[in-house]
Every structure is written in structure tokens, then in C-alpha cells.
């Protein structure tokens, strides 16, 4: 009987958790998008210049991203895939769409190594394809002076996009 009661409590707690998740998802789906963005010649040109075509799956996700970013509702999207499956190029396209519509974008990474890799990838695209980015990196190993300089570029709008580790999201040095 004790085990049955415990199982019932666990079930009810989990069920309550699922209800809250569903409610939050429904609320998020109704959150107004105050910054709708639309595909521009910049993203089309960038795609045409790439030495490879997007895969069928990437084209599908890129279409969904464009639709979501132009939607009257805020986007909440996670791009999931294996290493090397092309997630970064999709994120870069979304960041380019932000920049082309006059907004700043940011690419958060769970580790400093990945944040640096994203920064280097984006910087490489700037050099190779002449895209309108002024990337900046923000990580924990940067000196206080480097962080202040990065924050100043972000605040002034000079930096776009920002590649950072998740720990930097709430830090104000």
C-alpha cells in the first residue's frame, strides 16, 4: 500500500509538471513577435555562394525558420542533429536574416570551445563571402578589459552577431 501511494504521488507530481509545460507552451505560442524578420537578398546571395547545396532536411528547417521569424508570434525553436549535420549553417542563416533586417543576433554555446568554433566559422564566412557581420566573442576566459570592449561593441550595435557561452548571458562586467 505504501508503494502504491508513493507511485500515485509521483504520478500526480509528474502529471502536474506536464500540465504546466503544456500551459507554458500554449502561452509561448501566443506571445507576440515584436520583431518580425523576412528573408532578404543577403541570405539568398549567401546560399548561392556556398560551395554546397543545403540538404533536403536543411532546406526544410530553413523554410520553417524563415516562416517562424516572419510570423506574428515569437519563435521558440531548437535545431537538433548529429555532429556535422549542418546545424551551424542554419544558425548562421538565421543570424544573417536578423542582421539584414536591422537586428543584432547571438549564438549561445554550452562550452567555450564551441563558442570559439562558432566565432571562427562566422568570421570565416565574413572573409570568404563578404557577409555583413561584425562578429564578437564573449567567453569566461577573456580578460575584464576584453569583456568590457565586447560589451561596449554589443551595446553600441557594432557587434553582430555575438558568439558566447551560456554563462555570459547574465553576467554584467
Residue ranges and their predicted role:
Residues 165-172:
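Conserved small/polar residues in nucleotide/adenosyl-binding loops
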Residues 116-141:
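Conserved helix-turn-beta segment of the N-terminal RecA-like "Helicase ATP-binding" lobe
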Residues 136-147, 167:
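Conserved helicase motor
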Residues 80-82, 108-110, 138, 164:
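Generic beta-strand/beta-sheet core signal
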Residues 1-85, 89-106:
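Pre-Walker A segment
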Residues 94, 109-110, 149-151, 164:
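Short beta-alpha junctions and helix-cap segments that line functional grooves
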Residues 143-161:
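Conserved motor-coupling elements within RecA-like helicase/translocase cores
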Residues 97-114, 118, 130-131:
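Conserved SF1/SF2 helicase motif Ia
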